[in-house]
UniProtKB/Swiss-Prot annotation:
Coiled coil: none annotated. Belongs to the elongation factor P family. It is found in: Cytoplasm. Keywords: Cytoplasm, Elongation factor, Protein biosynthesis. It comes from Acidobacterium capsulatum (strain ATCC 51196 / DSM 11244 / BCRC 80197 / JCM 7670 / NBRC 15755 / NCIMB 13165 / 161). Gene3D superfamilies: 2.30.30.30, Nucleic acid-binding proteins. One of its GO terms (cellular component) is cytoplasm. The lineage of its organism: Bacteria, Pseudomonadati, Acidobacteriota, Terriglobia, Terriglobales. InterPro entries: Elong-fact-P_C (IPR015365), NA-bd_OB-fold (IPR012340), Rib_uL2_dom2 (IPR014722), Transl_elong_fac_P/YeiP (IPR020599), Transl_elong_KOW-like (IPR013185), Transl_elong_P/YeiP_cen (IPR001059), Transl_elong_P/YeiP_CS (IPR013852), Transl_elongation_fac_P (IPR011768). It comes from the Bacteria. This is Elongation factor P. The keyword Ubl conjugation does not apply. GO terms for biological process: peptide biosynthetic process.
Length: 186
């Protein structure tokens, strides 16, 4: 289905140069004496490469309709990640290449949405926040209060985030999946 570039929104899947791309950000720009254009940040769903592309406002964009299926993460075996459809209990496995940075947030029983196009998984949508356990960090200070001072903490999935000094090993914290940043204690 073709739409004008001005109707492109983050989260859409589009076909660009014959390949599927996820739209990450869209900015409408109108420089002084030039025609308006759309600056979009895209991720190639096959290769995972991120790039920016400039579309003219009237350019037709081919929007791809994908099937979004709620699934639950079960486990991983090397580079294979296994998910279960929560409606019919069928299992699907995806390669690490397809998941990209999302693997740093996957824990057992995490509810996610998997996008399928022509029966092939093309990506996943994580929840806004996830709860992860701190496995390694410097000891906390008893008198530490919320301030701009932070320290690195390694989480159960291997993700490293900056946390306040009062966070200790073994604590569960809430992490923003879009920014990869500490939000609060769980």
């Amino acid at each position: 289905m073709a739409i004008p570039a001005t109707q492109m929104r983050p989260g859409m899947i589009i076909k660009h140069n014959g390949e599927l791309h996820a739209v990450f950000s869209v900015e409408h720009r109108t420089p002084g004496n030039l025609r308006a254009f759309i600056q979009a940040k895209l991720r190639n769903l096959r290769s995972g490469a991120m790039f920016e592309h400039r579309f003219r406002s009237p350019d037709p964009i081919e929007r791809v309709i994908v099937d979004e299926i709620p699934m639950e993460f079960l486990y991983n075996d090397g580079d294979d990640y296994y998910f279960m459809n929560t409606e019919n209990f069928e299992q699907t496995h995806l390669k690490r290449d397809t998941l990209g940075d999302a693997v740093e947030y996957l824990t057992a029983n995490l509810q996610i949405t998997v996008s399928f196009f022509d029966g092939v998984a093309v990506g996943i949508e994580l929840p806004q926040t996830v709860e992860l356990t701190v496995v390694e960090t410097e000891p906390g200070l008893k008198s530490a209060t919320a301030s701009s001072v932070t320290k690195p903490a390694t989480l159960e999935t291997g993700l490293v985030v900056q946390v306040p000094p009062f966070i200790n090993e073994g604590e569960k914290i809430r992490v923003d999946t879009a920014e990869g940043a500490y939000l609060s204690r769980a």
